[in-house]
Amino acid sequence: MQRFLLIVSLMFSLLMAAAAHAAVSGPAQASSTSKLPRDLAQVRSSKVLRVLVNQSRNSSGEIKGEPVGIEYHRLRALEHFLNGRERQGDLIQVKLIPRAKEQLLGALQRGEGDLAAPGELLDPAQVSGVGVSAPVLDNVPLLLVGRKGERSFSRVEQLSGRTIALTTASGAGPAIQAINQQLALRKRAPIKVEWVDPTLAVEDVLEMVQAGIYHLTVVERPIALRWARVMPRLRVDSKVLIGQPQAVRWYVGREADQLLATVDRFLAGYRAPENQDAAFERIYRRQYRVHNPLARQERQRLQAVRGVLQKHGEAQQIDWLNLAALAFKESTLNPAARGVGGAHGLMQITPSAAQRVGVSNTANVDGNVQASARYLALIRRKFFASPQLNERERMAFVLAAYNLGPERVQAMRAEARRRGLNGNQWFFQTERIAMEQVGMGPVNFVNSVNKYFLAFNRERASLERVARR
């Protein structure tokens, strides 16, 4: 086993526009600190269209040169449209600036981009001070998504008292609030909303629903159907409409009338290519999928090793649930598991890695966990001790380095900064470099461990109550 980690915090720096259009890898990525609102004339003068994109992999992901984000094909087509009558030296290049969905319009208003492409519905009440495009997708309903084998629903009223997991800034939030007002009039229990951790995007929540970690979520119909093709245990309850269908749109600066008119002309004639999801389906169908780490048998396994995880977690100042999450990903909490390259045991540590931290016997659970905890702490101390990293991102970088090697992760952080991404943030930022250079393997590894940690952390009180008995 050779495992390592990556992580990053939030800081977008200026990336110089230059560089020719890379048709194979899709629109380039960039960031800008410009505060001046720009219209089409300024865009043509600079030869760069700065597009603020939703940082989720569903919206703007690219894996080893293959676009899997739904906005990639549209933005590439927009670039061709803008350059249709231009001479070679006057061509405009689209540059992507990935941001959290809830930050897109604010960044647009500050002049940090020329166009915002969220790829999802925005709350209409939050849309002000910007120009709004014609529909990118019209009449988009929000649908309930659950797991096959669990109860299905046909009416909104049946959701009374149920919990729905939503990502930050989900378009379903206001709709559920309106439904709850109607339920209150009927003296029915409200729908409860669990706002998930910001390290999770819509695709992550859907994966956790498929695993049974979350039971229900609500997403846009195109997103639900897209991911159901690669997550076959998802169940889409198409009869349950959450709110009224709305339009997915793009947004420009308030005064960018020429750019808005050009975007609207482009959208009026745009047709998505029939094979636009070919790479997405090929890549994601073979990815590791998380399981429910808190099913009955898994809880029993966790209880059996909980004491040793807590002991060595405390010794190395690592949350024991981080160790538990890593152990579940590596061995499904099976101390007898055998891997490749000599990796073995609960943590799938290799003898060479154990020897580096002074542990010679990893055949038993105690030594196996001790070696892994020490190794994680060594990586953290030598490479990721900066106070600029928050603890969640620090742990993500440690895991990435555990999987890839610390030096490689540090090089990825440097490349992220060079491109205007946030080198102190792993999730959705530095992970983009890993996806480009290595593929989904290390990104999937870190994300899976993170999901298991979040699943355990939701049940921390009950898991630690068991520990005190």
Question: What are these regions, as identified by a protein language model?
Answer:
Residues 76, 87-158, 224-226, 231-244, ...:
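Acidic, polar ligand-binding/catalytic clefts
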Residues 53-57, 134-150, 222-266, 286-291, ...:
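Periplasmic-binding protein-like
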Residues 251-252, 393-459:
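Catalytic and substrate-binding regions of cell-wall glycan-acting enzymes that process beta-1,4-linked
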Residues 285-332, 366-369, 383-387, 468:
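Export/targeting segments at the very N-terminus of extracytoplasmic proteins
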Residues 336-360, 366-378, 424-425, 449:
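Substrate-binding/active-site groove segments that recognize
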Residues 24-122, 128, 195-200, 263:
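Extracytoplasmic small-molecule ligand-binding "clamshell" domains
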Residues 50-59, 65-85, 121, 141-200, ...:
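Bilobed "Venus flytrap"/periplasmic-binding protein-like clamshell domains
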Residues 24-42, 69-81, 147-173, 221, ...:
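Extended ligand-binding regions for polar small-molecule ligands
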